[in-house]
From Swiss-Prot:
This is Large ribosomal subunit protein uL22. Keywords: Antibiotic resistance, Ribonucleoprotein, Ribosomal protein, RNA-binding, rRNA-binding. CDD domains: Ribosomal_L22 (cd00336). One of its GO terms (biological process) is translation. The keyword Transmembrane does not apply.
Length: 159
């Protein structure tokens, strides 16, 4: 079972938030909290609050054991950005984009659930690649059969 918490329009760049997200994926929640409390980044405090919210959601709403939870996924996607101008020389101006993030933390009580999902995705990709290879071979076969078709003319002279 997966429990999650979301937070939108967080005033931090998604590139900076992803660095912190990568630290906690696959860890136990207690370990993740320790990592986040010792990480000297602004994103660490924001993700720590979101992690605590996800833990509360898992225990209160889904009846999961808080000690047996793992961080299944931590995602920092791009949110809307605020555009500001800064004056430059000769009456011109440049744009400043103040980026925001949409954060999602997902928790699971099964530590092998992530590996199972990865195996399923790899199987789907393999199946898709095999289908593409079959289609490519069929196209090549069709092209070669058109090329090998006997012609009615030989050297410009009809028979």
């Amino acid at each position: 079972m997966i429990a999650f918490a979301k937070q939108f329009r967080v005033r931090i760049s998604p590139q900076k938030a992803r660095l912190v997200c990568q630290l906690i994926v696959g860890k136990k929640t207690a370990d993740a909290q320790n990592i986040l409390s010792n990480t000297p980044k602004k994103a660490a405090t924001l993700i720590a609050k979101l992690l605590n919210s996800a833990i509360a959601n898992a225990t209160n709403n889904h009846g999961m054991n808080g000690d047996a939870l793992y961080v299944f996924e931590c995602v920092a996607n791009q949110g809307p950005s605020m555009k500001r101008t800064i004056p430059r020389a000769k009456g011109s101006s440049n744009m400043i984009t103040k980026r925001s993030s949409n954060l999602v933390v997902k928790l699971s009580d099964n530590p092998n659930e992530r590996q199972e999902l990865i195996k399923q995705q790899k199987a789907l990709v393999k199946k898709r690649v095999e289908g593409q290879q079959k289609a490519k071979m069929a196209r090549q076969k069709a092209v070669t059969s058109v090329v090998k078709a006997p012609s009615k003319t030989q050297g410009g002279v009809q028979k």
